[in-house]
């Protein structure tokens, strides 16, 4: 016997289904579920009087070796680069085992053989929750260890960058220089509930000092103008990167001391490179570093202080810049240096270039002009600002939803940074076989405050009420680390990314590492065309007199925002 119920009642019980629409937080971004992998009438739900019980949705006979899951997230709405769908998510051995229909094949239709719910299965209700892949932030100044929990609680599960603590070199540059510091930072990484990876110093015009850092465990090299970003340095770093299959990230030469943008591009010579804050407010050839985004070998990123362009952006940046780069307001040359980097015209253009899919990656620049806990929020604020100012994307016209725009923006802090740094086989999307790094959101809090962060298949952090309360929800509700973040579980739920060469050198044994170490691969055979939904390479020009930006000959400009969604109303407490 079947039962017909209206959509509102169905959604309240099992979450939205195909054709239903969801507003993301208080933005104007509306997504529509494209496909429902669950089976009507055979839905899974845990709780008193619900279906996940012995002999019903839970198999009475299947063992773990016969395909029983460790964890099932039921009826979840997934937002990922590949689609916006509703499905059960199955997790086993810390990895995503299935996306589809879970349950008991003896009593239910459509259950996938690798998604059996049994006595070995934990359950979490994904009804009326959105699930995204854990965020990846590739521009981290490791200044303070407290950044890591702040990032985790915002929905970031992988942090890549460099540093040694609050030394002036780290305050300004994302670099962990030399074997001794690389070893110490890899040892420190053992303590943190986060996937981590460290850049060595790429600022050297000969190869041997760079080789030894990759051999020691750096996952890539970072070139920064504060150490000198000359063509010789760029060439040497890229030669070493090609030799070891690692990525090079670059903060180019704001002062044009060793050459102009064209000289840097000639030194790069068609080799793949990840450009940081490619608009230029965070640093880079003034005034036209933004042109780098048109090259097919450049993987262009933004940092979040310029995201999105608002009425407060310019004033805030000048003060931040003086502090972060050890400048003095009493030295005229320092003030001129700061002024040259902060250009309203290029910051406004950056908004539009993100919306067009020309800029490909979002990151933070943590404590060094960027906010480590705001990568996700700033990404969706930019999407909303562009939705309001530019309307439908061409790909969304006629669909009465913003699905393509949502896929484009979520890719900027998930799959694309993973591809850029050779870790997309492990993280960056909700796909079978990848590490189960998942973030669960209530739609009204999407992009601001996650409900639960799952890391390597285990809940690692969550919003949690008073531990002395009779139920989990009484205030004060704070983000707290959960069991996945403690003891030896941490070393199995989190990974450290290193070079292939360092694994061959057996650094785990030499340094005494217990955390999973995973090699980066495929960093040198990629280009911008591999960056999903963000692969456009139009011609970009910048007028050196008034900083006007044109794309394929058309001037691009937008007004600064005076109000933003996902802002103060979410962070009063």
Swiss-Prot record:
Catalyzed reactions per annotation: urea + 2 H2O + H(+) = hydrogencarbonate + 2 NH4(+)
Annotated positions binding Ni(2+) 1: 139, 141, 222, 365
UniProt-listed InterPro entries: Amidohydro-rel, Metal-dep_hydrolase_composite, Metal_Hydrolase, Urease_alpha_N_dom, Urease_alpha_subunit, Urease_AS, Urease_asu, Urease_asu_c
Localization per Swiss-Prot or TrEMBL: Cytoplasm
KW Metal-binding (keyword) present: yes
Cellular-component GO terms for this entry: cytoplasm
Keywords: Cytoplasm, Hydrolase, Metal-binding, Nickel
GO MF, one annotated term: nickel cation binding
Pathway: Nitrogen metabolism; urea degradation; CO(2) and NH(3) from urea (urease route): step 1/1
Residues noted as binding substrate in the record, renumbered to the chain: 224
Name of this chain's protein: Urease subunit alpha
Organism (species): Flavobacterium johnsoniae (strain ATCC 17061 / DSM 2064 / JCM 8514 / BCRC 14874 / CCUG 350202 / NBRC 14942 / NCIMB 11054 / UW101)
């Amino acid at each position: 016997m079947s039962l017909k119920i209206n959509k509102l009642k169905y959604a309240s019980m099992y979450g939205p289904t195909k054709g239903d629409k969801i507003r993301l937080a208080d933005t104007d971004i509306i997504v529509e579920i494209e496909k429902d992998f669950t089976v009507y009438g055979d839905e899974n739900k845990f709780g008193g009087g619900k279906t996940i019980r012995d002999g019903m949705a839970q198999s009475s006979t299947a063992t773990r070796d016969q395909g029983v899951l460790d964890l099932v997230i039921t009826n979840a709405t997934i937002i990922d680069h590949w689609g916006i769908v509703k499905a059960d998510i199955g997790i086993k051995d810390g990895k995503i085992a299935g996306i589809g229909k879970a349950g008991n094949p003896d009593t239910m239709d459509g259950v996938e053989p690798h998604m059996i719910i049994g006595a070995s299965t934990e359950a979490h209700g994904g009804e009326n929750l959105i699930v995204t892949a854990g965020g990846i932030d590739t521009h981290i100044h490791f200044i303070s260890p407290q950044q890591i929990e702040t990032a985790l609680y915002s929905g970031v599960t992988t942090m890549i960058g460099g540093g040694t603590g609050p030394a002036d070199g780290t305050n300004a540059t994302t670099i962990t220089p030399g074997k001794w510091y690389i070893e110490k930072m890899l040892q420190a990484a053992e303590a943190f509930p986060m996937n981590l990876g460290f850049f060595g110093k790429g600022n050297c015009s000969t190869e041997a000092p760079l080789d030894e850092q990759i051999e020691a465990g750096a996952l890539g090299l970072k070139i920064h103008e504060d150490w000198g970003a000359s063509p010789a340095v760029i060439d040497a770093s890229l030669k070493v990167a090609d030799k070891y299959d690692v990525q090079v990230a670059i903060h180019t030469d704001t002062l044009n001391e060793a050459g102009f943008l064209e000289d840097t591009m000639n030194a790069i010579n068609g080799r793949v490179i990840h450009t940081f804050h490619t608009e230029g407010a965070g640093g880079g050839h003034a005034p036209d570093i933004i042109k780098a985004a048109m090259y097919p070998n450049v993987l262009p990123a933004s940092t979040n202080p310029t995201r999105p362009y608002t009425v407060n952006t310019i004033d805030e940046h000048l003060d931040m810049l003086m502090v972060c780069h050890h400048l003095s307001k009493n030295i005229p040359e320092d003030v001129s240096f700061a002024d040259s980097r902060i250009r309203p015209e290029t910051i406004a253009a950056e908004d539009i270039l993100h919306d067009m899919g020309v800029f490909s990656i979002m990151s933070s620049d943590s404590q060094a002009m960027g906010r480590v806990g705001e990568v996700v929020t700033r990404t969706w604020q930019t999407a909303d600002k562009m939705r309001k100012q530019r309307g439908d994307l061409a790909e969304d016209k006629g669909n009465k939803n913003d699905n393509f725009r949502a896929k484009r923006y979520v890719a900027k802090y998930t799959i694309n940074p993973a591809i850029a740094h050779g870790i997309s086989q492990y993280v960056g999307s909700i796909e079978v076989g990848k590490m189960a790094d998942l973030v669960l959101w209530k739609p009204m809090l999407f992009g601001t405050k996650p409900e639960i962060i799952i890391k390597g298949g285990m809940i690692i952090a969550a919003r949690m009420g008073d531990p002395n309360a009779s139920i989990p929800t009484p205030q004060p509700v704070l983000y707290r680390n959960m069991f996945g973040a403690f003891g030896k579980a941490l070393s199995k739920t989190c990974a450290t990314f290193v070079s292939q060469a360092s694994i061959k050198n057996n650094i785990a044994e030499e340094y005494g590492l217990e955390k999973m170490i995973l090699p980066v691969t495929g960093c040198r055979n990629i280009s911008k065309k591999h960056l999903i939904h963000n692969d456009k390479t139009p011609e970009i020009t910048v007028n050196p007199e008034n900083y006007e930006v044109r794309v394929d000959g058309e001037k691009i400009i937008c007004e600064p925002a005076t109000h933003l969604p996902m802002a103060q109303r979410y962070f009063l407490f």
